[in-house]
Each structure stands twice: as structure tokens, then as C-alpha cells.
Swiss-Prot record:
Organism: Arabidopsis thaliana
Compositionally skewed regions (Low complexity) per UniProt: 178-187
Name of the protein in question: RNA-binding protein CP29B, chloroplastic
Compartments reported by the entry: Plastid, Chloroplast
Region: Disordered, residue numbers: 158-199
Positions of region (Linker (Gly-rich)): 170-203
SMART domains: RRM (SM00360)
Keywords, alphabetical: Acetylation, Chloroplast, mRNA processing, Phosphoprotein, Plastid, Repeat, Ribonucleoprotein, RNA-binding, Transit peptide
GO cellular component: chloroplast; chloroplast envelope; chloroplast stroma; chloroplast thylakoid; chloroplast thylakoid membrane; endoplasmic reticulum; ribonucleoprotein complex; stromule
């Protein structure tokens, strides 16, 4: 199966930006729109002001949209491409164990009590249209990210305790990855895929590449658990900076689950990027020190 994301981008009014985006139009209505046109000698400005309402919640925002068209000598206009908003990975929260009926608007409304919400994404299955049970929330500052993680990790929403994780784990979690080029994957202490569990020692694992920098262990586990029993899910981080290297590994309980994951999730959209899923190479023999 592939995945898609329903997202909301929230910001203050800016006449040269598109501060609000919604990819699931079924939950959006425009009320009392007003249109204005301004014609100059060299350009035409077109703007729409409207109030956005979500019928699923009381969350509402005023939205301003402005597009500028440059008029050519032949009378035709070229539309300037919109500028994409980008946010630091440090401002993004992973939110797992979401109730399947919770959409981006409801999630935004919930997290606004912790600070200014810039963007919200709930991940949906592209085929069925059903929520995958997790998403991402981007706040406007690191302090708000920390406050939201503290406030909502374990928070019960519609009978389900949320799992909220802020940013990459501290570098000390990666000690098991620093004692040799590849030997850490066979270490029973703290590296990836040590002892314990039939899947961990059997090589039933997949490589997951092209990960967004905001994806962590919990996001991987939430996505890949749909294809079978996940023994371990691990994103690989740089030892010095503590930031994601953009890839990771997921270990399953059986080889059949590995094949299911490759077939269903290779090319799936996760946090705005198409992930690459393939069978991982066999671990090298454990080194003796």
C-alpha cells in the first residue's frame, strides 16, 4: 500500500505566501468569500479572503491567498510558482497511536494549547483513504515543541494514549553504532538487532531509505507494523550531530512479513518523501574484542 498525507499549514497573513494548505478537500468549506482585483500597467493582482472551517471540529482560521500574474507584452500572464514552506526538523513532533477518526484539523486544535502550530500532517493510506494512525505536528519554536511533547505524550484521545516524540534522540543512544564500521548490528548490548526474539537473529529485516529527517523509530514502527509483527525499528543517527542519516532498518518476525513490507511500502509517502524499502543485507559475523 502507498501512503499520503493530509496537511494543514498555518501562519500569519503574508500577501506573498500561501500560508494554509489542505490536501483533503472533503473537510473544507469556504464561507463568505470576498474577491478583489487590482489592475496596474504591468501586473494584475488577484486575492481571495475567506474563513476556513472544519466540520469535524471547532478549529477555524482566517486564510489569505494572493497570487500575482506578470503581464507579458502579448497579453498573456505567467503564474509565479508558489514558494514551499520549510521548517527545521527540530520543530517537528511525531504523534503516534492516533485514533483513526482524528484528522489534521482536530490534531491542530489539540496542539494549539501548547503553542503556535505551523503545520499538521496526518498520514493516510493512498488506496483506502484510511488514517494510518500517526502524523506530524510542526511548532514555531523549540520551546513549544518541548512543551507539547511533555503535555501530550501519554495524553488520552478518544480512548487511546498518544505517543509524542520531539526531535531526534540524544547522541548517547547511538553509542552502540560507534564501535566499528558494521559490528554494532550484531552486538547484543545496544546495537541494532542483537539477541532476543526470533526475528532479531534471523535476518528478517528490511532497509528503509530516503527517510525524512523528522522520521524516528516510532514513526517507522507505526508504518511497518501494518505488514506484520515488528521486532525492532531503528533510524540510524549521526554519532556526532545526533541527526538522522536518512535511513533505518525494520526487523520482522518472519520472512513473509519482510516480503509483504517490501511489496506494500516501497515507494510509499512518509512525511513528504517516497521511501525506499528493500531486503537488508545479512549481518556480518560478530566481532570479538
Amino acid at each position: 500500500m502507498a501512503a499520503s498525507a493530509s496537511s494543514l499549514a498555518l501562519s500569519s497573513f503574508n500577501p506573498k505566501s500561501l500560508p494554509f494548505g489542505v490536501s483533503r478537500p472533503a473537510s473544507v468549506s469556504l464561507l463568505s468569500p470576498s474577491l478583489s482585483f487590482k489592475l496596474n500597467s504591468d501586473s494584475v493582482s488577484f486575492s481571495i479572503a475567506a474563513k476556513w472551517n472544519s466540520p469535524a471540529s471547532r478549529f477555524a482560521r482566517n486564510v489569505a491567498i494572493t497570487s500575482e500574474f506578470e503581464v507579458e507584452e502579448d497579453g498573456f500572464a505567467d503564474v509565479a510558482p508558489p514558494k514551499e514552506q520549510s521548517f527545521s526538523a527540530d520543530l517537528k513532533l511525531f504523534v503516534g497511536n492516533l485514533p483513526f477518526n482524528v484528522d489534521s484539523a482536530q490534531l491542530a486544535q489539540l496542539f494549539e494549547s501548547a503553542g503556535n502550530v505551523e503545520m499538521v500532517e496526518v498520514i493516510y493510506d493512498k488506496i483506502t483513504g484510511r488514517s494510518r494512525g500517526f502524523g506530524f505536528v510542526t511548532m514555531s519554536s523549540v520551546s513549544e515543541v518541548e512543551a507539547a511533547a511533555q503535555q501530550f505524550n501519554g495524553y488520552e484521545l478518544d480512548g487511546r494514549p498518544l505517543r509524542v516524540n520531539a526531535g531526534p534522540p540524544p547522541p548517547k543512544r547511538e553509542d552502540g553504532f560507534s564501535r566499528g564500521p558494521r559490528s554494532s548490528f550484531g552486538s547484543s548490548g545496544s546495537g541494532y538487532g542483537g539477541g532476543g526474539g526470533s526475528g532479531a537473529g534471523s535476518g528478517n529485516r528490511v532497509y528503509v531509505g530516503n527517510l525524512s529527517w523528522g522520521v524516528d523509530d516510532m514513526a517507522l514502527e507505526s508504518l511497518f507494523s501494518e505488514q506484520g509483527k515488528v521486532v525492532e525499528a531503528r533510524v540510524i543517527y549521526d554519532r556526532d550531530s545526533g541527526r538522522s542519516k536518512g535511513f533505518g532498518f525494520v526487523t520482522y518476525d518472519s520472512s513473509q512479513e519482510v516480503q509483504n513490507a517490501i511489496k506494500s511500502l516501497d515507494g510509499a509517502d512518509l512525511d513528504g518523501r517516497q521511501i525506499r524499502v528493500s531486503e537488508a543485507e545479512a549481518r556480518p559475523p560478530r566481532r570479538q574484542y
